[in-house]
Amino acid sequence: MESIGVLMMCPMSSYLENELEKRFNLLRFWTSPEKSVLLETHRNSIRAVVGNASAGADAQLISDLPNLEIVSSFSVGLDKIDLGKCKEKGIRVTNTPDVLTEDVADLAIGLILALLRRLCECDRYVRSGKWKQGEFQLTTKFSGKSVGIIGLGRIGTAIAKRAEAFSCPINYYSRTIKPDVAYKYYPTVVDLAQNSDILVVACPLTEQTRHIVDRQVMDALGAKGVLINIGRGPHVDEQELIKALTEGRLGGAALDVFEQEPHVPEELFGLENVVLLPHVGSGTVETRNAMADLVVGNLEAHFSGKSLLTPVV
């Protein structure tokens, strides 16, 4: 397989790079100063693309690579891959489901606690020496708060199970009712927000879910409600979020993802009722290595004529 060209779109994992380089002719797209020259030079040898939540395979890239056979995503999300174009050209697509579910769900609960109990502020309070001047202000309890989840898939379900351990009633919105769960279903996101103290975004990003959390949803969540986003940045209308937070119409927000990563609206930096993370939902050594193994395993299976491990297309 050493002659098979694999185009890696951006830095993802040194472990993944090493494993790919052992097996294939690895081409690093981000290191090339002349990307068009790289594609023209290797267009016939590139048979696989490895992308992630930041960079995948759009229609133009797919058209530029006539011998492309498979796109393997180092992510569970597929919003950076033109799935329609892949289906049209018979290109296989894989992702990394399941292995990152637990980490992302853990982080969602961590964000809830960090926001409600103001853990980041508490840390700064101690470091700055302010504790000597007086006690920190009282915060908000998590246990018993109603948690609304947008998207009750693998990750959403894992978040729900964790929140249940905090005696939280669980509500959800999904494309369809889940008959095998006891959680309360709401037919619209606005209805869900109106009946939840904490709203968690955990659905895939599609054209239908882009800005699924808009001004109407934020107003329904209200001045005591908080928003947690561990999905994708474009799920939330960031400009409306900034307005809702600064105007006091929304109680707080904890965000692991943003609309234009790695660029974060500076208006959020000065707000005390927000927690901001650099898209680290699956960012543990164990999970990233497991994701890398899935990417490599899918490529090896494809080029060996075997069944894909996690096929999407």
Curated annotation (Swiss-Prot):
| Localisation per UniProt entry | Cytoplasm
Regulation of activity is described as: Strongly inhibited by oxalate.
Major enzyme class: oxidoreductase
Entries under Pfam families matching the protein: 2-Hacid_dh, 2-Hacid_dh_C
Q: What is its EC number?
A: 1.1.1.79, 1.1.1.81
- Per the UniProt entry, what are the Gene Ontology biological process annotations, in alphabetical order? oxidative photosynthetic carbon pathway
Catalytic machinery residues:
R232, E261, H279 (proton donor)
Q: For this protein, what reaction is catalysed?
A: glycolate + NADP(+) = glyoxylate + NADPH + H(+); (R)-glycerate + NAD(+) = 3-hydroxypyruvate + NADH + H(+); (R)-glycerate + NADP(+) = 3-hydroxypyruvate + NADPH + H(+)
Q: Which InterPro entries match?
A: D-isomer_2-hydroxyacid_DH, D-isomer_2_OHA_DH_cat_dom, D-isomer_DH_CS1, D-isomer_DH_NAD-bd, NAD(P)-bd_dom_sf
Give GO terms: molecular function aspect only.
glyoxylate reductase (NADPH) activity; hydroxyphenylpyruvate reductase activity; hydroxypyruvate reductase (NADH) activity; hydroxypyruvate reductase (NADPH) activity; hydroxypyruvate reductase [NAD(P)H] activity; NAD binding; salicylic acid binding
* Similarity section: Belongs to the D-isomer specific 2-hydroxyacid dehydrogenase family. GyaR subfamily.
Subunit details for this protein? Homodimer.
- Designated name of the protein: Glyoxylate/hydroxypyruvate reductase A HPR2
Q: Which organism is it from?
A: Arabidopsis thaliana
Which gene is transcribed and translated to give this protein? HPR2
